[in-house]
Curated annotation (Swiss-Prot):
It is a multi-pass membrane protein. Belongs to the KdpA family. This is Potassium-transporting ATPase potassium-binding subunit. One of its GO terms (cellular component) is plasma membrane. InterPro entries: KdpA (IPR004623). The keyword Iron-sulfur does not apply.
Amino acid sequence: MSFRNIHYFLLLIVIAVPLGKYLYVAFFEKGKIDRFFSPIEAVIYRLSGIRSLEEMTWKSYCTALLIVNAALLGISYGLLRIQHYLPLNGAKVENMEPTLTFNTVVSFMTNTNLQ
């Protein structure tokens, strides 16, 4: 084991307990910042139609996941198809052809490494 690895493990051991205590407080106890952000969060939830105290079933979670993935797939496909017309395209990259665009977007969505 190298000197760098030993230092890394020692650092992990030293910060494990303080970091664990901090995370416990951050997730399970009300803090000062919650008084500021809770009303803002409530407004965002109300406008979005989210019921924050209601847990999702597996069916509603799966539906939400599929809807978000479909939306991201559409947005990504659209961006890659019109990239030539977008501002800040300094390299003047041309639009991708449809099948290559679809392949690229699906590989991003599924985290596929096509090498």
